[in-house]
Regions:
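Residue-level hotspots at or immediately adjacent to binding/recognition sites across diverse folds
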Residues: 1-199
Length: 199
């Protein structure tokens, strides 16, 4: 059964991540307005809740629930640069800036110990893949150019990230203790890794 998530009349929207706990369904996303910025939000059992950000707008890209707290990762535009952030129960927390670079938070995972792990990247003309562990930035030293991290998963004591690098041709990768490239079978096509699960 398809469930249409409500947004203001005639606006387009995107659902970016989903989390299910018992009978509760949490969905992160954002919607466009006719004249204003993009609005980050989440839906709980079909009810929409807008998330605070600057007047430049933002996107909510990943959602998780831990010990009753609704935690959402994303980013927003502060008028000068894009700023990676997360919301916990509707309160926005900025992740540390890296100089004057844009920063983006794409995915989050809560570790068994309750640590908030967020994957993303930073940079302007070039990028660096990274993740934040409770706000502390840790770079992923990916070998290729323009790397980004799209996904993260905490398993045991390990932190796994997945993403891609490259420009004209992209190569998907995942990283645990070292980089593992996910090259296409015939070597001719681009690949992206956009989510990761460890069992």
């Amino acid at each position: 059964m398809t469930h249409v998530l409500p947004v203001p009349t005639s606006y387009s929207a995107e659902a970016t991540s989903i989390y299910v706990s018992g009978s509760n369904v949490y969905v992160s996303g954002f919607y466009h307005t006719s004249t204003g910025p993009v609005v980050p939000c989440y839906w709980l059992n079909g009810n929409r809740y807008d998330l605070p950000c600057s007047t430049g707008g933002g996107e909510a890209l990943s959602i998780d629930v831990s010990t009753g707290s609704i935690i959402i990762a994303g980013y927003y535009y502060n008028g000068s640069i894009y700023v990676a952030c997360y919301w916990s129960n509707g309160i926005k927390y900025d992740l540390p800036l890296v100089g004057s670079y844009n920063t983006y938070a794409n995915s989050l995972s809560i570790s068994p110990e309750g640590d908030i792990l967020i994957a993303g990247f930073y940079g302007t003309s070039s990028t660096t893949a990274c993740y934040w562990d409770n706000g502390t930035k840790i770079d992923r030293n990916v070998t290729g150019i323009q790397p980004v991290a799209y996904a993260i998963y905490a398993a045991g004591t390990g932190v796994y990230t997945a993403g891609r690098y490259g420009t004209t041709k992209t190569i998907g990768y995942y990283w645990s203790d070292s980089e593992k490239d996910l090259s296409p079978p015939n070597g001719g096509y681009s690949t992206d890794a956009i989510t990761i699960l460890v069992q």
